[in-house]
């Protein structure tokens, strides 16, 4: 019989790994999937509003436009007001097409306008494109 802690561990692993495992399976036939790690530096006092915009609008709009949301994080000691997240795409071309569609989506434009009525949320965005190594579980 499994102990309570083992059951909780198994449930947590299933919850956190299933989106990634599903994406990896779906992408198995793709030749060159691309990952993008994006770091947003929020303006002072704006991180909560930025997180709310992602929670309430951006994540769903990314999905709508063909982007795979891998995960979203903030540093434990977040002195720089950072949000870090990873998106995945079948190719670099698909990424560009998805972001173009996302940017022109009226729902995004409305959410952006509403969230910035008291000032811009983000002062800097840094992004980097990644591809899996031959020994990575996610490629």
Q: For the regions a protein language model found, what residue spans apply to each?
A:
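Short, flexible turn/loop "capping" segments at secondary-structure junctions
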Residues: 30-34, 77-79
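Acidic/histidine-enriched, glycine/proline-rich intrinsically disordered or flexible terminal extensions
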Residues: 131-139
């Amino acid at each position: 019989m499994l102990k309570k802690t083992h059951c909780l561990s198994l449930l947590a692993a299933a919850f956190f790994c299933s989106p990634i495992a599903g994406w990896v399976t779906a992408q198995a036939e793709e030749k060159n999937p691309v990952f993008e790690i994006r770091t947003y530096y929020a303006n002072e006092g704006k991180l909560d509003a930025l997180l709310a915009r992602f929670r309430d609008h951006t994540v769903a709009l990314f999905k709508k436009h063909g982007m795979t949301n891998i995960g979203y994080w903030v540093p434990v000691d977040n002195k720089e007001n950072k949000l870090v997240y990873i998106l995945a795409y079948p190719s670099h071309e698909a990424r560009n097409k998805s972001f173009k569609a996302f940017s022109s989506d009226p729902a995004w434009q409305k959410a952006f306008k509403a969230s910035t009525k008291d000032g811009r949320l983000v002062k800097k965005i840094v992004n980097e494109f990644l591809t899996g190594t031959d020994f990575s579980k996610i490629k």
